[in-house]
Amino acid sequence: MTLANDPIVIVSAVRTPMGGLQGDLKSLTAPQLGAAAIRAAVERAGVAPDSVEQVLFGCVLPAGLGQAPARQAALGAGLSKSTTCTTLN
């Protein structure tokens, strides 16, 4: 199978920085950090934000983040409301 025939394509991956307890990133929520990572991944891949069909978002401690952290991050990154989002614990 060639890439052109495969309907699933991973075009980019980015991770957030590793922070310390009460460090420089303490004012940001996981979805806010995720939005920055998603924006960077989309920019690096050179694709339009509305062409992203799915987001898989890892979140170790989702308590207190509200509903659907993956959805929050995707919308914060400017992706389409039609993008499917899954939060992985």
Whereabouts are the PLM-identified features?
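Terminal domain-initiation and capping elements
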Residues: M1-A4, E43-A45, G76-A77
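Short acidic capping loops at alpha-helix termini that bridge into adjacent secondary structure
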Residues: A48-Q54, S82-T84
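Condensing-enzyme catalytic core mediating Claisen C-C bond formation in acyl metabolism
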Residues: M1-P31, A40
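Short, well-ordered amphipathic alpha-helical segments that serve as non-catalytic structural scaffolds
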Residues: P31-G46, P69-A73
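Conserved beta-strand segments that form the floor/walls of ligand-binding pockets within enzyme
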Residues: V9, L56, T87
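Conserved catalytic cysteine-centered active-site region
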Residues: L28, C59-N89
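N-terminal glycine-rich phosphate/pyrophosphate-binding loops that anchor nucleotide-derived ligands
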Residues: T2, A45, F57-A63
